[in-house]
Amino acid sequence: MDFINIEKKWQEFWWKNKSFEPKDDFNLPKKYILSMLPYPSGEIHMGHVRNYTIGDALARYYRLHHYNVLHPMGFDSFGMPAENAAIKHGIHPKTWTYENIEAMQKEFEALGFSFSKNREFATSDPDYTKFEQQFFIDLWEKGLIYRKKAMLNWCPNDKTVLANEQVIDGRCWRCDTEVVQKELYQYYLKITNYAEELLKDLETLEDHWPSQVLIMQKNWIGKSSGLQFGFKIADECLKACNGIQEIEVFTTRADTIYGVTYIAIAPEHPLVEHAIKRVSQEDSKIIKAILNTTQRERALEKKGAFLGIYAIHPLTKQKIPVWVANFALANYGSGALMGVPACDERDFEFANLYHIPIKVITQSLQNLPHTKEEVLKNSGEWSDLSSSVAREQIIAYFEKENLGKRVINYRLQDWGVSRQRYWGAPIPMIHCKHCGIVPETQLPVTLPEDIVIDGEGNPLEKHASWKFAQCPKCHKDALRETDTMDTFIQSSWYFLRYTTPKNQRENQAFDQNYLKYFMPVDTYIGGIEHAILHLLYARFFTKALRDLGYLHLDEPFKQLITQGMVLKDGAKMSKSKGNVVSPKEILKKYGADAARLFILFAAPPAKELEWNDSALEGAHRFIKRLYDKANAITPTTSKPEFKGVILNEAQKLARKKVYEALKKSHEIFNKTESTYAFNTLIASCMEALNALSAQNNERILCEGYFVLLQILEPIIPHTAWELSERLFKRENFKPIAIDESALMEDFMTLGLTINGKRRAELKVNINASKEEIIVLAKKELEKYLEKASVKKEIYVPNKLVNFVIA
């Protein structure tokens, strides 16, 4: 079998005939199958191969069954690696990026992926940037983007800001460098405006998304209900607070309010800037040190300092000391917390560390802290009530007395989207001394190509002819925004752009007819590592564009498949571990079909896949055997029929196995709750080929191949097309009805029991009468019944025979 030339032949055929382009007929049933687009690093890895093989199998199946399939691919082509390559190799980021795209396109083609070429694009293409910049302006004008100065996560290696979601355990999500804090201006997308909708709409995805992803998003959004109220600054401290009169806090445990013995505020809290003058030099150093540490460092150990001021408890009127604490976060709630050491582990630890008093407010005799809800004491009129009852009554009291109010809080923070780098989509804003921040009117704002990238800061800041611009409003001298957009913006709407053909994209982000027809994506495939980054942002962006009038839908992805990692020697493949398997080498040695077959057979999509060379060789052998066995078949253009034909057991088994595989194929691809266990489908096909090989009827072999090659086309397309063309002129690439008669059993197996205890099994003809079955059952159980007196004979059709004996 010359797999190299066979694969090349069909790849050229598909390309020449535009075999994978969706039709413009909006009356056809559609399927939009999408794998997450890759960063164009220059070469694909086995993780890519697995992801795209899963998606391609789905797309090919639905095409065979007369769906209008959109199965596109593009490239997430902005980002830091291109700038790093420019520094390392002295090559322009644009040149490096587009050369890599070309190389990856060839690899995709070599794997037989059935992508629509007419939908392909890179997110760094100017006509993509043009509409992204228009979205940015629209969001700005609608109030969904704002700019402010804040302490931000800064990656010293990439020299750029990171969103909270891009900091993993205190390190940069991309390069693993430890993140520090830096004060900068930043544009923010108001994702918090959509927190409740993002949370509520998770319910619509429950039967179609992995539960783990739903839980991760729910926790990240972090909805909580509680009491918001203020501690008034003590009169003698007001002067030091420069007009700030109270400290606002939020708590989900209003029932513990009588246990407050200190207030903890974040070092970024506005009170600190003024009151820090009252503290000792040593405490001032502690506060400033906390200010310059990342959230990860703050979580390692509790640290704080007394701010030298007091606030008044709203109920007891006692003075409560105000502390700066590293566990109080400026970006959650108001940046202030009430410290209740008797009822909270963290508060207890901090109080013990700094010898802050602890007030017990529960009747439990257990060791402190009492974190569970219990009966209260030392809690004024709410003593002797349970925590839950007291909590509701205290909130009601605060609202009645105008001391506070019940509010909903979210852990989710607004999305910072400014990045201090060159290779990204320019933020289309102009800074004018006279007009303020003004949106650009000439789009797209493109990047200058005559730049020097040396790793020192943002190259756009140093490019005078690009940076200095004219205000679109007053036409006076102004400065162009030099930050570029977070690349997660590009991946938050690319799936919408795919719906529109290339020749209709110039003047519109997407054509409404195509958009309404193809969206939402029916099946989306990618790694679970994107659960709270890309997937959350894409959901938000869809809703925001809907509210701008661009879209008609609430959720972008109907079904989500999160494929597991590809491992070798028990670890994720990486160059540093020396366990990388090159797709190019696999294709050269075994071919694309063998690689695809192994990928789909080795493990279900959601599970991790352990690389196994011998299993890959086994996949190659199966394809060769399938190919060689086809030589015994006489070409035809129709499936042989067997109505009324008498067959022997081997022949019946062969037909049964073939149609079992066909039935399993439909179940795997079409069931709503399907886990896409391609491994079980492939196992069924292997069983069918074994059964076909064990019988000697050429017409049954022909029928078997007619069906099997259709089943296998999504998995090993080159081989399936080659054999189907040769044997059947591809007439088998149409929906095939399951021959139910082939699945009917001639025999059934019955359980044989005595007094309900199972003793044996009996295989009998399915048409045998009750009397015949009883006789055969007695004979089978002769050794148990010969000395017994049978009182009753019970036959449960198709299941068992039971004898009741004395």
From Swiss-Prot:
The record's InterPro entries line, in alphabetical order, gives: aa-tRNA-synth_I_CS (IPR001412), aa-tRNA-synth_Ia (IPR002300), Leu-tRNA-ligase (IPR002302), Leu_tRNA-synth_edit (IPR025709), Methionyl/Leucyl_tRNA_Synth (IPR015413), Rossmann-like_a/b/a_fold (IPR014729), tRNAsynth_Ia_anticodon-bd (IPR009080), Val/Leu/Ile-tRNA-synth_edit (IPR009008)
The record, for PROSITE patterns, names:
AA_TRNA_LIGASE_I
Give residue numbers for sequence motif 'HIGH' region.
38-48
Where does it localize?
Cytoplasm
> Where on this chain does ATP bind?
K575
Stretch forming the signal peptide:
none
Under Enzyme Commission nomenclature, its number is: 6.1.1.4
User: How is this protein annotated for GO cellular component?
Assistant: cytosol
Predominant place of localization: cytoplasm
SUPFAM superfamilies tied to this protein: Anticodon-binding domain of a subclass of class I aminoacyl-tRNA synthetases, Nucleotidylyl transferase, ValRS/IleRS/LeuRS editing domain
Q: Name one GO molecular function term.
A: ATP binding
Q: Name one GO biological process term.
A: leucyl-tRNA aminoacylation
Q: Name one Pfam family in it.
A: tRNA-synt_1
Catalysed transformations (reactions) = tRNA(Leu) + L-leucine + ATP = L-leucyl-tRNA(Leu) + AMP + diphosphate
Motif 'KMSKS' region, per the record, lies over: 572-576
Tagged with keyword Secreted:
no
For this UniProt record, the keywords arranged alphabetically read as follows: Aminoacyl-tRNA synthetase, ATP-binding, Cytoplasm, Ligase, Nucleotide-binding, Protein biosynthesis
PANTHER family, per this entry?
A: LEUCINE--TRNA LIGASE, MITOCHONDRIAL, LEUCYL-TRNA SYNTHETASE
List, alphabetically, the NCBIfam families matched. Answer: leuS_bact
Record HAMAP family? Leu_tRNA_synth_B
Q: Which family does it belong to?
A: Belongs to the class-I aminoacyl-tRNA synthetase family.
Protein name, entry field: Leucine--tRNA ligase
